[in-house]
Amino acid sequence: MALSDRPGGRLRRAAVTVELDDIQAAVLRYRPEPYYGTHILAHFDDAHAGRELLRRLAPHIHSAAEWWQAGDTWISVALSYSGLSALGVPEDSLRSFPDSFRQGMAARAEQLSDYGANDPKHWEQPFGNGDIHIGVSIFSDSPDKWRAALAAVRHQFGELAGVTVLMAQDFGAQPDDRNSFGYKDLIGQPAIEGSGADPLPGQGRPIKAGEFILGYPGEAGVTYPMPYPEVLGRNSTFAGIRKYQSRVGAFNRFLRENAQTLEEQELLAA
């Protein structure tokens, strides 16, 4: 479904001030409804194989050009800090990344409230041990196009020695689906200033591009530091992938124990 077809009216075009051709589609595109997809997580056994995989994947990565035409299929690629290191990125460039990215989620468990049952020692493998070097994500608006894109990605891995696939996780949703807790997906997607489209009804004012894309001013009016050299960071972004076990019963019990009426439970849940 293109954004212009979504409930709430047609999307109005606006000025483009970011380099859409150099930004991955997944940074700006809304997931279509319905959507189908797969995350593939892999490890580089040696730098040469990792670089060869990136060379093979590069022609298949979609840019954010005309991202508002969201009803299609796109492929994106992300590299972890350990992945950049495994590729042989120079040490001075690696040190130019923020500490939070260099350390990874497991090392920042306290800041992320990952304790008790959420402690990294309980995480499903391969999460939290630094083995994930690359993530390849496929999104599509139809099962046939999803399968075709997935087959194209798997073909790039081919018989490439030196790259090990650690996990392939399928995902998706239909237009009326809600998550395990009863919430509707995609309601928190912000509009980004300079991306080429005005906000949809209810989105509020556009957020400065620098809050999401490196190389542009953020809400404070300054451009945040980027990795060195500039080509390594400009028009990129930071992303996280986490796999949760939804404890719906515990969540509903918390609502009942802390709210007296159904209306209060709804407010607390919101």
Residue ranges, per PLM feature:
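Long, low-complexity, Ser/Thr/Gly/Pro-rich intrinsically disordered segments that act as flexible linkers
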Residues: 1-270
